[in-house]
Regions:
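Patatin-like phospholipase
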Residues: 2-6, 11-101, 127-129, 135
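Active-site gating loop/helix substructures
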Residues: 108-135
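Short secondary-structure capping/junction motifs at helix and strand boundaries
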Residues: 75, 103-112
Length: 135
């Protein structure tokens, strides 16, 4: 039997599932990365799924979130939101943190990871990319 682990989104609330996963790893006596055969996540859950697919422990991911939450979820000004941009957070620190802590290419992951994505224009839904689909 194969086991897929899916993690929900929720921005800064993504730390909640990580608290549960830390406890689960402690109870199991092993990393979820070694238990799951594939990982999936939406939004902030995709970051957690990517970490697990790279062999990181829930504890490592929890600490990464805890130490970086204020910088990742630093709100942008309301003027910027009302202009051409529709996002509420500046992603520059998040991008830097991901580049420093995660593998650069999906084919380098230890396990398959699946991350749904779409264009924000609402006109189309694109393919869900996985480990075997290249970059």
């Amino acid at each position: 039997m194969k086991l897929g682990i899916s993690i929900t989104g929720g921005g800064a609330l993504g730390i909640g599932p990580l608290q549960f996963m830390r406890r689960l790893e402690a109870d199991l006596g092993k990393k979820l990365a070694s238990v799951g055969d594939a990982f999936a996540g939406t939004s902030t859950g995709s970051i957690v799924a990517t970490g697990l697919a790279n062999g990181m422990t829930a504890e490592t991911l929890y600490n990464l979130y805890k130490d970086n939450l204020p910088k990742i979820f630093k709100k942008v000004s309301s003027t910027r939101i009302l202009s051409k941009s529709y996002y509420r957070y500046d992603n520059s620190y998040l991008k830097k943190m991901l580049q420093e802590n995660f593998k650069k290419h999906m084919y380098e992951f230890k396990k398959p990871v699946y991350i749904p994505a779409t264009f924000l224009n609402g006109k189309s839904v694109e393919k869900v990319w996985g480990k075997d689909d290249g970059d």
